[in-house]
Amino acid sequence: MLEMRFHARAGQKMEAAVELLTLAARAEGKYAQGFTKRSSSSKESSVRGFVRVDEQPITLNSEIEEPDLIVVLDEELLARREVTKGLKPTGIMILNTTKAPNQIREAYGCQATLGVVAADQIAQEILGTTLVTPPMLGAVIKVTQVVPLEALEPLLMERLGPVGKKNFAALQMAYKETVIQERES
């Protein structure tokens, strides 16, 4: 089973990413489960998302404490210890950043396999917005191959109509531009 945990700030529409990835996996004949949880403090509100995908029925129904994959929609969230907590030793972290993987390793002491993508720039260039959900989904698909990239296109078109094409284009660009660096030993 592939277990993924997403971290975002409120308003980044991370819930849509969780839902779309879950629906795409189901459309591909896999078992999938996805849900989100909001947490708020006096300073700011954040959202965590959880996705499980498997070839077998999923009987768990809990938050994911030890994910195979952590997806961070806002690099500033890495300053919070709980964001990377529990990542499996063979785990992968995908991050929205303009920094190279080695810069992330130096800044945050991350030893996991890293996938980095400039999702903010892609969203601005293609969508004219700061909505990073489509580019981050492209990065997730590149790193995990959990579903074919094309599995998202009909879902985006169905949900967003004509704007779905631009969202799929952002997803495709992120898929191509995501840089993966294997974990450090």
Regions found by a protein language model. Give the residues of each.
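Active-site cofactor/cluster-binding pocket
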Residues: M1-S185
